[in-house]
Amino acid sequence: MAEFKRLLAQLCCDEKQEEELLSYASACGNDGADGLVLIDNAKTDEEHEFHIGLIRKMARAIDIPIFAGGRVKRLEDVKKYLYAGAKGVFLDVSVEENVDMIKEAADRFGSEKIFIRLNDAAQTKRIPEYAQLGASMAFLGEEVLPEAAEVIRTMEEQMHYYVMSSSGETEALAKELK
């Protein structure tokens, strides 16, 4: 199997930065990113709806897939992200209600569209459970990588992984997975 790396650009939404975010998304696509991870940190329903609209605009403007998540409180939120143009939705499994939602979301929308986001090393022990429930991909915060490496090696046929690094240490992080 040929080895390759995928570059996913990550951005957190802020309502006040719509033009900058659209410009950034376009630049990511033009500069070779393989996808865009959009983290919706909305605190209100109005902000959340704004971010849904932003996904819709980005999906029309760029040719790379968008993966969205962050503020998922119910299955309706998953549907809104997907209908807005996200290729997949990640559920933050530090929120137990999101773990409970994995199977229902995978059954309704397809497991290829349901991902998990791990930011806590304790969650890595549950990766097999998340895969069994229907999650097909995991976004790993760099802080969980050392603990996740062994689980990833045993589960790589069932789930794909992407490391989300904000430190720029992606080369060192990638070596941890080998």
Regions found by a protein language model. Give the residues of each.
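Generic serine detector
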Residues: 23-26, 94, 111, 136, ...
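Hydrophobic, well-structured mid-protein blocks that either form specific transmembrane helices
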Residues: 78-120
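Conserved N-terminal beta1-alpha1 strand-loop-helix module at the mouth
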Residues: 1-64, 75-76, 116, 120-139, ...
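Conserved short-loop catalytic and cofactor-binding motifs
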Residues: 42-46, 69, 90
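Conserved beta-strand edge residues that scaffold enzyme active sites
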Residues: 42, 73, 95-96, 144, ...
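Short beta->alpha connector loops at strand-helix junctions that form conserved
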Residues: 70, 91-94, 141-142
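Catalytic cores of alpha/beta
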Residues: 61-89, 123-133, 149-178
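Contiguous hydrophobic segments
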Residues: 99-115, 126-137, 174-177
